[in-house]
Amino acid sequence: MLHFLSSSSPLNPQFLLLPRQSARLRVLLSIPVSAMSSSSSSSSRGALAAAAVPSLSADEAGAAADEAFLRYTSPSMRRSGGGGVAIVWFRNDLRVLDNEAVVRAWAASDAVLPVYCVDPRISAGSTHYFGFPKTGALRAQFLIECLEDLKRNLTKQGLDLLIRHGKPEDILPSIAKAVTAHTVYAHKETCSEELLVEHLVRKGLEQVVIPQGGASNQKKPRNPKLQLIWGATLYHVDDLPFSVNNLPDVYTQFRKAVESKSSVRNCSKLPPSLGPPPGSGLDEIGGWGTVPTLESLGLSMTKAEKGMHFVGGESAALGRVHEYFWKKDQLKVYKETRNGMLGPDYSTKFSPWLASGSLSPRYICEEVKRYEKQRIANDSTYWVLFELIWRDYFRFISAKYGNSIFHLGGPRNVESKWSQDQALFESWRDGRTGYPLIDANMKELLATGFMSNRGRQIVCSFLVRDMGIDWRMGAEWFETCLLDYDPASNYGNWTYGAGVGNDPREDRYFSIPKQAKTYDPDGEYVAYWLPELRSIAKERRNFPGASYIKQVVPLKFDGGHQKRDQQFNRQRRPGHMYRRQK
């Protein structure tokens, strides 16, 4: 994910021609998870209610956001005198705080026009290989909330958000012409579909002619320019101690190099006001437009009765940082709790806002440093930064290897035989594998759009190691469901887990019995998502035998966990054996 796009790399065909949707899958994504569970409503009584993340009220989150904005506002900032109109094209950077594209546009203009394009290839498109919906209802709703909050925060800063439904390469040139914009500012993306859109926008802007004031022999007409800015990572690409092409393939080597030889740039400051918007041209293009609804996107959703409900938007993101770091004081124990699976506070839960760009990784870093000065610095405070560096690593790896992170063989072009058995995959997708730890995690994903880091590793290992299913099916299903989906992290992690990425231990295997005993010893997590297990003794909830549905495959035997896996497999009902299709 950077400016390296191989001409031989295949692009998703929907970016050339929008494909037909899978009606069955889109209906599936509109069904509340409770309707997909075999348990009765009476068996779920007593379950913990859904928890909002953050748990702050809207007023509390807004106050935390206002305080953050105040700390990063500089009354001394002045425009550089560039004049004219600049457009800010919002993409995966749905925030005002530490948004360099916004600040650069403000500084270089007399008026700023923020624009967001609801691209049908994203909102209604299909995944490349298996045709799953590209955006499920849960993430769509989260993004809608992000747009609503972005619009509010821009209004507080003297602007507004112009929203259009359509392809950016069609919309932005027409808007630039209407408001006579000299530049479109946006944050740089790095994967092929996003890079193609950047290319098409640039070509479209080249066809727009903006007349200049004054005598014709003094000022020639010009074309609006596309100015792309790096701003999605903790470490800026220009500050790496190596070129992207020479990026270390092993995370530890990458981390040690950037920690010792690079520094994190400061968050950008804000002026007291980002206004005004353009004074003319908006009527010509139909006004500001409206934030989409699920219905307008052809989606529907029933509010989940349990699990976590993430609130979209920059204000909620800043509220969550305040809540987790300062109000609940959880940062100091993050490393000890991060492998949990149940509840909102075992980890930061920042990832959905990072993925949408509602939260800046540099802001998190500066808050960690502030916490270390005011409260405590320990392994836990460092570990939050450690995880942000992982996020950087996958983005830079995708920049280095381009589309290979989406290919079956991954960056290392590993040749392996994989099954694409649809029935077997659907048992994994729907949480019907017969292994409670797998099924509980998959039901959480369906209900909330979220899954713990530990859970993701376990269900990935099960799909690719125990089931032998094509890892891309899992990656594309995660693309559909995850609130925190971004291509670099999602596909980077899946290639890593499938043994086709940059993991030195390419045969990495997560034993379900070992994981269950270590991370859910009392079966609280599986009983929460699988209410039929609540009546079983705690020590047997992850190993329920005939009390639970039949296991669809035996576990892979590996030397380290063979005895445990044999014990687990003996609970299978006799006479059932899965044979992988050739």
From Swiss-Prot:
Disordered: region residues: 560-582
Keywords: Chloroplast, Chromophore, DNA-binding, FAD, Flavoprotein, Mitochondrion, Plastid, Transit peptide
Compartment annotation: Plastid, Chloroplast; Mitochondrion
Record bears the keyword Chloroplast: yes
PROSITE patterns: PHR_CRY_ALPHA_BETA (PS51645)
Highest taxon of source: Eukaryota
Molecular function in Gene Ontology: deoxyribodipyrimidine photo-lyase activity; DNA binding; FAD binding
Keyword Transit peptide: yes
Transit peptide: 1-49
GO biological process: photoreactive repair
One Pfam family named in its UniProt record: FAD_binding_7
Residues of the Photolyase/cryptochrome alpha/beta domain: 84-234
Cofactor binding comment, as recorded: Binds 1 FAD per subunit. Binds 1 5,10-methenyltetrahydrofolate (MTHF) per subunit.
Cysteine disulfide partners in this protein: none
Family stated for the protein in its record: Belongs to the DNA photolyase class-1 family.
Role this protein plays: May have a photoreceptor function. Binds ss- and ds-DNA in a sequence non-specific manner, lacks photolyase activity.
Protein's name according to its UniProt entry: Cryptochrome DASH, chloroplastic/mitochondrial
Organism for this UniProt entry: Oryza sativa subsp. japonica (Rice)
